[in-house]
Amino acid sequence: MSFAVSLDELPKDLKLESASIYFSWLLKDVLTNLNSSLWLKWPNDFYLEGAKIGGMITNIVGDSMICGVGLNLINSPEGFKNLDIVINREKLLELYYKNIENKLSWKQVFSKYKLEFHRNQNFSTHSDNVKISLKNVELQNDGSIISNGERIYSLR
C-alpha cells in the first residue's frame, strides 16, 4: 500500500527524517489496539517476536510525503512471520487513515515509541552499508540514534 500526505499536513514538530517512525507508529498503534503483539524496530520495521513481518518507507516528492507499507497479512517468506491477527485489508486501511487524520504530534507519538525502544537491544540496523548494533545506542528526541558518538537518522 502507498499513499501521499502533503508536507503542510504533517505535525509541525516532526523532523522529516523521522517520518518513517511517525507513520510506522501510527499503523502499529492501530494493530496493537486490535490485539496484535507486533512492535516497531528502529526505524521502520514491524516485528513479531524476533521476526520481521513488514516495514515502512517514506520519501519526499515535491511537496508531499510518499509512504509505502508492506505487511505480511496472510503469507510470508521463509524466515519471516505473518501478522498475528486476522483483519480485512480495507478495514485496516480505514482505521489507519483515521489514525493519520487524528494528526497526533510527534511528541505524542514519540513519547509512546520511546517506552518500547528497549525491544531493539538484540537487533541491528545498517547505515552507509555498516551494520550497527542497537544494543548501546541512545535514542534522541527527534527519533535519531547516537552510536559511537555519531547521530544517525532513518533515511528510509
Region spans (language model):
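Short loop/edge segments at beta-strand edges and connector loops
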Residues: L40-W42
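Long, positively charged amphipathic alpha-helical accessory segments at protein N-termini or as interdomain linkers
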Residues: L7-L38, L48-R156
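Primarily the active-site beta-strand->alpha-helix module of PP2C/PPM metal-dependent phosphatases
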Residues: M1-S6
